Amino acid sequence: MLNIKKRDGSIVPFNLNKIKVAIEKAFTAVNKSYSDDIIDMLALRVTATFNDKVKGDVVSVEDIQDSVEVVLIQSGYVEVAKAYILYRKQHEKLREMNSTMLDYKNTVNNYLKINDWRVKENSTVTYSVGGLILSNSGAVTANYWLSEIYDDEIAKAHREAQIHIHDLSMLTGYCAGWSLKQLIKEGLGGIPGKITSSPAGHLSTLCNQMVNFLGIMQNEWAGAQAFSSFDTYLAPFVKVDNLSYKEVKQCIQSFIYGVNTPSRWGTQAPFTNITLDWVVPNDLAELPAIVGGKEMDFKYKDCVKEMAMVNKAFIEIMIEGDANGRGFQYPIPTYSITRDFDWSNTENNRLLFTMTAKYGTPYFSNYINSDMEPSDVRSMCCRLRLDLRELRKKSGGFFGSGESTGSIGVVTINMPRIAYVSKTEDEFFKELERLMNVSARSLKIKRNVITKLLDEGLYPYTKRYLGTFGNHFSTIGLVGMNEACLNANWVGKDMTHKEAQEFTKKVLNFMREKLSDYQEEYGDLYNLEATPAESTSYRLAKHDRERYPDIICASNMDNVPYYTNSSHLPVGYTSDIFSALDIQDELQTLYTSGTVFHAFLGQRLDSWQAAANLVRKIAENYKLPYYTLSPTYSICQEHGYLEGEQYTCPICGKKTEVYSRITGYYRPVQNWNDGKRAEFKERKVYDIAHSQYHGKQVEEFVCDDQARSDVKMMQKDEPQKECACCQKGDDEGLLIFTTKTCPNCKM
């Protein structure tokens, strides 16, 4: 028996008379004569037309109405078809009016009672009155975008989950990287009617200005805010005042606690990312250092000792965690692994890789085998040679952005849906092209809107320190390539198979080519991102499962579907990290924006050497641009850090917080949305000790007495272990863009 799926998702029996009545109304509207035989014939032709769209004895109302339009036109009743289209449009407008007129009662109650998936859309938003205010304003703003700004095709594609337009709840750009050099030269302020601070003359002042700057900018943007060369730019302040290590650590501590204080909408801490050079970059080495807005009589290359002090202080504070041993969420640090990275057994190396082994805090930028250079973070607005057919890579890390660049918005394409509705590979690429066109157009519209608002003063500090969105990308991403391959009848295998991997490469290259087309068409920068998809993977899968009950999703739990992020492997595929890296290395290099390999670990690594060896092995033998080690750990309010996934404290029996990376940052698993929690349960963590690497061997760290001593001192607040760095078991766990506000452009 044939059934109809209505727009509200309900299923009702098919009724041919309803088609007849609708056609009769269209004839009547244009005073066109008709007979019962004509109506019967047209109605039967409609049923024949939509027959191939029937899935499991169910067809949607939209598919039937589309078929009516086609049949009327093909039968020569063009005027009647126009009347029918107008009839549909009028009813659609009525529905949109109802959806636009928000039900304030449900909007508030859904948040208070946590009835809506959007309450946990972002795991950084605390359930609070601030979160309620953000939820309410976000609902209004999202409706404004979909009803007043975007055209019907774009709004429909989002509402029907063909695509996901990110950050609809905010009338702002997505993410931005800022020039720390500019802040150091010019100070904080310059906005009429607002307090202005002179350039910082001391490290403590600069740390306060950075906290305030990031907090201000976070309120003008939806996503991450970033500084590059954090250690390089701060080092001269240490040198000028001849600061002691204790004084440096106090300053860095105030910065870290400052950026972790909830100070933005939704009772959130500013989403901050910093890039640390570790080694003075070549493009900065010979430049005069700047302190207090003035050039000093020494260069950045002369501040190596002070740079090491900044790095040591930062890492020690991150290792110590807060008063309860909880790891700091921000800033997310990205370290540059270059060919001249010093892998020797230094104090800072031991600290860096202990932090990596314990909390999984840092990201690593691979500048050894990837096609990036450390100076790329500063090259966007000053040295950008852009062939409009060339796709430029967005620098700055997974969440970060290079100086004076970023992204104005992100649209993610639902790949499993395309594969499911396509009968052939050709159909797949036609539908992908259509949705990419819709996505690109939506991003152009957004760029025009927020540029107008920038010029009108809605983002005063962005206007002051950036001035233009000309160097910001329009970002298109994808989700669920693994499930797309499973749903595609011409592939029918997941990402662990060669056929799926080759098809994915074909898809990514196709998308890259289309982005080049958009750059030529619109004159803007476009990039391809492996979308983090914190809530998108759940929202799209949930929508698809309701509409297409037999579509293949990632979850083994029928009531909690989700899609695998971007083109990642199934989360339960393997415990061998090198097997996963071998596959992902060929795919992640095809993205031109945020993409990362997460080495999920069940608990902390045995030693800092184990972390260092793994980081080095990946950098020297793989091309993927960004990666991170992600151990799971737990926090007890009474007893602090606990290794691995422990929901109750083994000492006091109280409930704990279990921390893991939800997409790119650590949050308590209890705060995740249902889809990501299902993913966490199905994750297979990597077993480094038993992973088989078949490439060349790199020199590995060995443990010595000095290392033992240093690591013990570093972990003095933790339970004492016989040898923290060695003992197994105990410690497991040609177009030139310039920007008038950029200090580099002014040089």
What is each stretch, according to the model?
Residues 1-106, 468, 684:
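Charged, amphipathic alpha-helical regulatory modules used
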Residues 67-72, 277-278, 460-484:
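Core structural elements
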Residues 90-94, 100-470, 491, 497-651, ...:
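Conserved catalytic cores of very large enzyme subunits
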Residues 631, 643-644, 651-654, 715-721, ...:
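Flanking scaffold residues of small Cys/His-coordinated metal-binding clusters
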Residues 636, 649-652, 723-726, 742-745:
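Short cysteine-rich clusters marking metal-coordination/redox-active sites
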Residues 640-644, 653-656, 729-736, 746-747:
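Cys/His-rich microdomains that often coordinate metals
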Residues 647, 653-700:
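Long insertion/accessory domains within large nucleic-acid-processing enzymes
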Residues 685-722, 736-739, 747:
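Acidic, low-complexity intrinsically disordered tails
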